[in-house]
Amino acid sequence: MENAIRSLQQEISEYELASIKDIEAFRLRYTVRKGLIAGLFGQLKSVLPADKPRMGQLLNQLRQTADDKLAAATAELASAESKTEPKLDLTLPGRRTFIGSEHPVQKVLGEMKGIFSSMGFSIATGPELELDRYNFDLLNFPPDHPARDMQDTFFITRGNANGDVLLRTHTSPVQIRVMLDQKPPIRVICPGKVYRNEAISSRSYCVFHQLEGLYIDKGVSFADLKATIFSFAHQMFGSDVKLRFRPSFFPFTEPSAEVDVSCYLCGGKGCRVCKKSGWLEIMGCGMVHPNVMRNSGIDPEKWSGYAFGMGVDRTVLLRYKIDDIRLLFENDVRMLRQFPA
């Protein structure tokens, strides 16, 4: 057995460990539980009792030699690999950290809320899934109004006991809910997301954001409405912006008007965005229709009020001179980075 130990010791000392593959092969051949060294330990039981102490000492020395050789080779290889890795230059600038910012729609909506809050308006919200009773009936829409058609409105379910369920087409239902829940005087704005079954283009989208306002009190007139809109427009677009009111029709207001501002791109000279008119529509408005007041339990003989509604996304286009509304919904980081926090 002593000869076998001496022979294995010579073999171990001459074994070259130049790579990870060599180290693993050495470990599997000599140092594992079923390796050659363990096999010699298993043969100790057949050695004469007088020779066992010396043979055991030789085997322990052999195992220690193998373990030391394996550890030294592993450390040397790790050290060589670390020297080949590129050094870290602490003088180089670190990677740039990009800080998120508020989306331009939310940024503008926040400014609009601030302007109207300074005028005494509170903020009211409501569900985006709405009943046609609030979206159409109580707002004085006749049964055959085109807005009720599936080509204009996203209906979720029809024929329910409580009425058809739809994605609200405007935030006016919030005004109805407020009038049903509160007694005049009322002064609220209703911001939120709305949905319409429209073709997607540079100027229209199937989902967009609206902000509507409602003011009901004694003696409220159209002059009060105009003063509110002029004040908002000058704070939002600048004191040099021009406005015009055009007579219009809405089922829920009478009289009604649409409000235009001078085109932000051409300065009123006429361009592709304003369709050569020099004007861009920003909102609709009017005095609250008496039928809407009655539907909400408010006496139109005692109270009067005005309402207005505008597209927040359209205002973003005006504010930042963007000519395609689709950019606001694509989440293109290249575009969003232009609006720092």
UniProtKB/Swiss-Prot annotation:
The keyword Magnesium applies. It is an enzyme of class 6 (ligase). It catalyses: tRNA(Phe) + L-phenylalanine + ATP = L-phenylalanyl-tRNA(Phe) + AMP + diphosphate + H(+). Binds 2 magnesium ions per tetramer. It is found in: Cytoplasm. Mg(2+) binds at residue 254. The keyword Nucleotide-binding applies. One of its GO terms (cellular component) is cytoplasm. Keywords: Aminoacyl-tRNA synthetase, ATP-binding, Cytoplasm, Ligase, Magnesium, Metal-binding, Nucleotide-binding, Protein biosynthesis. Its EC number is 6.1.1.20. Its main location: cytoplasm. Belongs to the class-II aminoacyl-tRNA synthetase family. Phe-tRNA synthetase alpha subunit type 1 subfamily. Tetramer of two alpha and two beta subunits. This is Phenylalanine--tRNA ligase alpha subunit.
